[in-house]
Design a protein with these regions (language model features):
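Interface amphipathic segments
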Residues: 1-410
């Protein structure tokens, strides 16, 4: 078969007819194809109905696409494949995907794809996305060179926009049973406010290098390492630079070890932990002493936390400079302890020699919370510095058998 088509038109019903005849297991017309509206093609067609080469222009209600593609299908195997070049200008991508965050897209790409029924598609992409609208901002100059396979992407993505550049190279797969991440990211002078990613940080820029090689979909499942180098934040009235931060997670004999090392914070957690069940663990222990105040949840949450933690705080400039948290720790402070769901035991012990929260200056701060026997107790000691002196505060609280006693001295 060979021919030149001055115009081949298909309505939405016509598109449905084609889908029904090309599909191995027809379950109706996909919504994304229905949104195309009326479809027309002008150009050249050659080959067979199941193996067609097309060259020309495809017009839909959402925009036009220039293409030079080979389309193949095998209905018995549920296979649909394509390869070639596609190009479009200001195509209404948001309407096609029914996503209000997206707008129009302009690209020139080489594509190779295979779709098999009941399997994730395999798509290779190489070329340039000249522009794409996201969150009311038009991103420019995105280079793609990679493969989408088994729900993940392996390759390179580079953004070279007036409001920042981002380079990604590696493999990311969040669709696998155990998510995997192995990539390098270089962020240079990204302005998140101007990119409409946040309402914060006007006139601020971020730069960093991030290398990740780990598995797991959450902190307590993570095995591997994340390394952040040269984090730089600049704004008209403030700046921050962090040389390095390393997060390493390992697992031995069924117990996790998570370590964070940086110039402002060093922390380690060892044992069995699930961060999303930690609030439930705390409430379960406290409920033992004040059951009338802390009622059991309608749907009990299983908790199996049994871990030690040790945190050393050296500098909190990152909190006040980047996150606008009005907390400053002036000297080495510590927070350590343990949780044990099986034994219903906890201990939290902290020492803060000198810190400031908003306009409050505190020295000799100490906190202790533990339940060594048949009661739970908390102690707080601190000195609140004033312009005309200082106030020493002491708080002791204890709970047992639904009774709470508190003593405050100053």
């Amino acid at each position: 078969m060979f021919g030149t088509l001055s115009e081949l038109t298909a309505t939405t019903r016509g598109v449905g007819f084609l889908v029904r005849n090309l599909s191995h297991d027809y379950n109706g017309v996909p919504p994304v194809l229905e949104r195309l509206g009326n479809v027309s093609f002008r150009g050249e067609v050659s080959g067979y109905f199941t193996d067609i080469v097309t060259y020309g222009q495809l017009h839909t209600d959402l925009g036009g696409v220039n293409m030079d593609l080979k389309l193949s299908s095998d209905k018995s195997k549920g296979l649909f494949a394509y390869s070639g070049a596609v190009k479009t200008t200001d195509y209404k991508l948001g309407k096609l995907l029914a996503n209000e965050q997206l707008g129009e897209i302009t690209f020139n790409l080489d594509v190779h794809g295979r779709h098999v029924t009941d399997r994730l598609p395999v798509v290779e992409l190489k070329g340039l996305i000249a522009s794409v609208d996201y969150s009311r901002y038009r991103y420019e100059n995105i280079t793609l060179d990679g493969e989408y396979k088994q729900g993940g992407f392996n390759g390179k993505v580079a953004l070279d926009d007036p409001n920042g550049s981002i380079y990604l190279n590696g493999d990311v797969n969040v669709a696998s049973k155990v998510p995997t991440f192995n990539f390098l990211a270089v962020v240079n002078k990204v302005r998140p406010h101007d990119l409409n990613l946040t309402t914060k940080y006007p006139d601020a820029e971020f730069s960093l290098k991030l290398k990740a090689n780990f598995t797991g979909g959450s902190v307590d499942e993570m095995i591997g390492e994340i390394n952040v180098d040269s984090l730089e934040f600049t704004a008209p009235d403030k700046a921050y630079f962090m040389q390095n931060m390393n997060i390493r997670a390992t697992k031995q004999n069924g117990e996790n070890q998570l370590r964070l090392t940086s110039e402002f914070l060093k922390a380690s957690i060892e044992g069995k932990f699930q961060y999303h069940t930690l609030p439930a663990s705390i409430l379960n222990i406290m409920r033992k002493y004040v059951p009338s105040l802390i009622l059991p949840p309608k749907k009990p949450i299983e908790t199996h936390n049994n871990f030690l933690f040790d945190i050393h705080i050296y500098n909190t400039d990152i909190l006040s400079t980047i996150f606008d948290i009005p907390l400053t720790v002036y000297t080495h402070s510590t927070l350590k302890g343990y949780f044990n769901d099986a034994l219903q035991r906890l201990r939290i012990e902290g020492y803060f020699p000198r810190l400031q929260y908003k306009n409050n200056y505190i020295e000799s701060g100490m906190i202790l919370c533990e339940n060594p026997a048949d009661h739970i107790r908390a102690r707080v000691r601190l000195t609140n510095l004033k312009k005309k002196g200082a106030v020493n505060l002491s708080l002791d609280a204890q709970a047992k058998d639904d009774n709470v006693s508190t003593t405050l001295d100053w």
